[in-house]
Design a protein with these regions (language model features):
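Rossmann-like NAD(P)(H) cofactor-binding subdomain of soluble oxidoreductases
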Residues: 2-86
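Soluble or luminal CAZymes and related metallo-dependent hydrolases
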Residues: 31, 104-108, 161, 165
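Short, surface-exposed, polar/charged, turn-prone segments marking secondary-structure boundaries
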Residues: 38, 51-54, 75-79, 97-101, ...
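Rossmann-fold dinucleotide-binding core
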Residues: 55-142
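Active-site-proximal catalytic alpha-helix in oxidoreductases
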Residues: 130-155, 160-167
């Protein structure tokens, strides 16, 4: 176990005339409706919505931008809060990323690759992230429900519960 502190530059407000080469939107799914109007009004061209919200098509429609300017990504990590800090597990540091229902344009892929150039962060491109996110949720929700039922101790899961996770 290693303790690290990362300082990532973030903003807490986005004015309509602010411009960024890439805008990474990292909010909880329940917060998205509040930030979408701000993002839509902004003049930046390329947006990457990172998270597990299975509504990529609806977000794309709301943003009213060309499909090749909006990406959806899922960070390959997990974690929990413990004593006021975040304990994270990294499963191959990187992100699965792509368009809502079609592959990203070559220009967008190059822009993303350039942003992570010189890092160990691996990008895996997927052509239909709306599908990918829905499949991920269908796979992970049963595991989450059993986790909650066992108070986080999966060794207490019954045979029936374990079977439901992978059925």
């Amino acid at each position: 176990r290693r303790t690290t502190t990362e300082r990532v530059k973030t903003i807490d407000a986005l004015a309509p005339d602010d411009f960024y080469d890439l805008v990474f939107v990292v909010v909880q799914a329940g917060q998205l409706p509040d930030v979408l109007p701000v993002l839509k009004a902004n003049r930046s061209q390329y947006f990457v919505f990172v998270g597990n919200d299975p509504h990529a098509k609806q977000v794309l429609e709301y943003m009213q931008r060309p499909a090749d300017k909006i990406a959806f990504g899922f960070q390959n990590s997990a974690g929990h809060r413990e004593h006021g800090r975040v304990v994270s597990a990294h499963v191959g540091v990187g992100m699965t990323v792509g368009g809502a229902t079609a592959p990203l344009s070559g220009a967008f892929r190059i822009r993303l690759k350039t942003a992570f150039d010189g890092t160990k962060y691996k990008l895996t491109f997927y052509s239909d992230m709306d599908e990918w996110l829905k499949c991920h949720i269908a796979f992970i929700l049963p595991v989450c429900y059993v986790c909650y039922a066992c108070n986080g101790d999966l060794t207490r899961a019954t045979r029936q519960q374990r079977g439901a996770m992978i059925d």
